[in-house]
């Protein structure tokens, strides 16, 4: 189930990227 590990890694990276993007948007709006 190597592809499961790959999907998990991609999902984790996407999640962190999404959180970072949301944080940047929130900072921009708050300013």
Curated annotation (Swiss-Prot):
Localization: Secreted
Keyword Ligase attributed: no
GO CC, one annotated term: extracellular region
Domain of life: Eukaryota
In-chain residues carrying the UniProt-annotated modification Glutamine amide: 31
Database matches in InterPro entries: Dermaseptin_dom (IPR022731)
Gene Ontology process terms (BP): defense response to bacterium; killing of cells of another organism
Primary location: secreted
Tissue expression from the record: Expressed by the skin glands.
Pfam families: DD_K
Keyword Oxidoreductase among record annotations: no
Entry keyword set: Amidation, Amphibian defense peptide, Antibiotic, Antimicrobial, Cytolysis, Hemolysis, Secreted
Function: Antimicrobial peptide, active against the Gram-positive bacterium S.aureus, and the Gram-negative bacteria E.coli and P.aeruginosa. Has hemolytic activity at 286 uM.
Similarity-based family: Belongs to the frog skin active peptide (FSAP) family. Dermaseptin subfamily.
Protein name (Swiss-Prot/TrEMBL): Dermaseptin-TA1
């Amino acid at each position: 189930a190597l592809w499961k590990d790959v999907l998990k890694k991609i999902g984790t990276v996407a999640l962190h990227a999404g959180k970072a993007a949301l944080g940047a948007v929130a900072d921009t709006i708050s300013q």
